[in-house]
């Protein structure tokens, strides 16, 4: 799903918990993918000690449709 569309879909769900999988760990941040709805975003809090493939429970903390940003926390 396009990140801007995903941000629109997720915007009313800020504060909800989601099951997610870690898809990337880089110096710029840790990225996770939720499966329902299919969306990927940045894990902004709680990223220490996670590896690609780890399954986590994450909370949606922000969604910005204009910029296509989706942020999660553990």
PLM region spans:
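Structured C-terminal cores of nucleic-acid metabolism proteins
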Residues: 1-74
